[in-house]
């Protein structure tokens, strides 16, 4: 066995938890392009955004100057239920791979929601309650975000309406029941309950849905129901801000032991986990203090960074949300029903998209059978059953560690283990039975999505 000079798990003291979120946009030389009003094509004002989002969250969304924003005491108190989360040295995985690489992962699955999503859910619910709202609406893919928000709303006694992507609603019935346990109403999307849902069902009969569809329904419900606002689990900059606690804790823990990661790897859907994990490290790179390699890993079935276009596009299928300049496959792109429901989004966070355009991070896509091979390999040696989404980062981390085995390099790798996969056993079953397929969209498939992108100069 290797000499364990560094603990298997590094836990911070409660007193070491971040008291502020880090806003990476403050350090970006090239700021992300502004959100546009879909009717006027002019930058969205705070007043316009306030019709959809909570007021304080609008202020955070538009804030590109303050590097640090204080975390309210009520949110920090809630964080203490499950944070600080552990930074784990993957000694057993290293030994299994026989690699000179040093592998670390930040484990965010140690709460009932099973993922990192609670970090932003509690913040958004807090600001909704503070504003005096009756409730909130949202979308969810695999269900972690919906679960996290239902927990947060229950804590603050808010009503919670969740539109769950239909394929995940059917694949993960128990995830649905957890949400209902916390008082949320859960509707499969697209549905007959909204005008946009009915339109999508008419245009795409038999569709299994997408995050873009679910967002449209949630926004419609929020904007047509008195006392409600829409909240979301990824994509927008306010969510990346809240998720910066992941990277901040990681950096504090690594600094305590004099560890500097060479590369930082995160799965990428809308960008919340990836952006939160890399934020403080990326800030250091932007300020010229240190250099790191950042790798975004996305599903080959929904390759927004690796095969998408960097343009203004709608954030939702129904085209009611603001336009964002991002890497996108087109808001009309309906990804195949793969088993990483939380990554089935057509676009990418605007700040991360700008960073990718500027060459600050690398992106790669992986097929789901290879992802589940990595998930199983990890589970057998590290004792955690990883979520399919998280397993995209595991795949890349293993690949990089094996490269180190070939070259003899002793690179230090940090990846984000966003959550657990206990509600994903249908996916694991299909993998074990040899029934899992790898779908990669053709150029013709992508062209259909690109055709719906608005022409904005």
Each PLM stretch: what is its role?
Residues 137, 145-208, 304-314, 425-433:
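Active-site-proximal loop->helix
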Residues 123-133, 147-159, 180-181, 278-288, ...:
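Alpha-helix C-terminal capping segments
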Residues 68-70, 194, 200-238, 246, ...:
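Active-site/ligand-binding loops adjacent to catalytic centers
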Residues 120, 128-167, 260-274, 294-295, ...:
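A short, small-residue-rich loop immediately preceding and capping a beta-strand
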Residues 268-276, 368-434:
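Claisen-condensing/thiolase-fold acyl-transfer catalytic domains that form or cleave C-C bonds
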Residues 86, 105, 117, 124, ...:
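Buried hydrophobic positions in well-ordered alpha/beta secondary-structure cores of metabolic enzymes
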Residues 107-118, 136-145, 236-239, 265-270, ...:
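Active-site nucleophile and cofactor-binding loops and adjacent substrate-binding regions
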Residues 3-133:
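Positively charged, low-complexity intrinsically disordered leader regions
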């Amino acid at each position: 066995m290797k000499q364990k000079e560094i603990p298997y798990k590094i836990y911070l003291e409660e007193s070491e938890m971040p008291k502020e979120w880090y806003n990476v946009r403050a350090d970006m030389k090239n700021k992300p392009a502004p959100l546009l009003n879909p009717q006027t094509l002019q930058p969205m004002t705070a007043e316009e955004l306030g019709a959809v989002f909570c007021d304080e969250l609008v202020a955070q969304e538009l804030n590109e100057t303050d590097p640090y924003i204080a975390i309210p005491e009520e949110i920090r108190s809630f964080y203490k239920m499950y944070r600080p989360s552990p930074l784990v040295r993957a000694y057993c995985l290293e030994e299994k791979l026989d690699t000179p690489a040093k592998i670390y992962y930040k484990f965010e699955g140690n709460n009932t929601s099973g993922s990192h999503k609670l970090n932003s859910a509690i913040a958004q619910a807090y600001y909704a309650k503070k504003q005096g709202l009756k409730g909130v609406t949202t979308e969810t893919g695999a269900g972690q975000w919906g679960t996290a928000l239902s927990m947060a709303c229950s804590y603050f006694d808010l009503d919670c309406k969740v539109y769950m992507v239909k394929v995940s609603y059917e694949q993960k019935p128990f995830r649905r029941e957890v949400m209902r346990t916390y008082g949320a109403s859960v509707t499969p999307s697209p549905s007959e309950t909204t005008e946009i849902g009915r339109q999508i069902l008419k245009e795409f009969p038999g569709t299994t849905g997408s995050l873009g569809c679910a967002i449209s329904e949630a926004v419609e419900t929020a904007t047509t129901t008195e006392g409600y606002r829409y909240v979301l689990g990824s994509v927008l900059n306010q969510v990346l801000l809240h998720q910066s606690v992941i990277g901040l804790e990681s950096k504090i823990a690594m600094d305590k032991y004099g560890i500097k990661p060479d590369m930082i790897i995160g799965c990428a859907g809308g960008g919340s986990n990836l952006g939160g994990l890399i934020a403080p490290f990326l800030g250091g790179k932007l300020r010229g203090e240190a250099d790191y390699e950042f790798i975004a890993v996305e599903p080959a079935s929904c390759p927004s960074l690796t095969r998408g276009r960097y343009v203004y596009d709608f954030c939702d299928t129904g085209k009611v949300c603001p336009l964002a300049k991002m890497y996108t496959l087109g808001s009309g792109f309906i990804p195949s029903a793969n088993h990483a429901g939380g990554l089935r989004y057509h676009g990418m966070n605007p700040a991360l998209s700008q960073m990718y355009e500027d060459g600050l991070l690398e992106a790669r896509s992986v097929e789901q059978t290879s992802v589940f091979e990595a998930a199983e390999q990890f589970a057998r040696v590290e004792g955690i059953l990883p979520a399919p989404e998280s397993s995209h980062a595991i795949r890349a981390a293993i690949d990089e560690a094996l490269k180190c085995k070939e070259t003899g390099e002793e690179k230090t790798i940090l990846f984000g283990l966003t959550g657990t996969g206990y509600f994903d056993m249908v996916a694991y079953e299909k993998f074990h039975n040899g029934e899992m397929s790898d779908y990669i969209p053709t150029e013709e498939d992508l062209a259909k999505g690109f055709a719906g992108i608005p022409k904005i100069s």
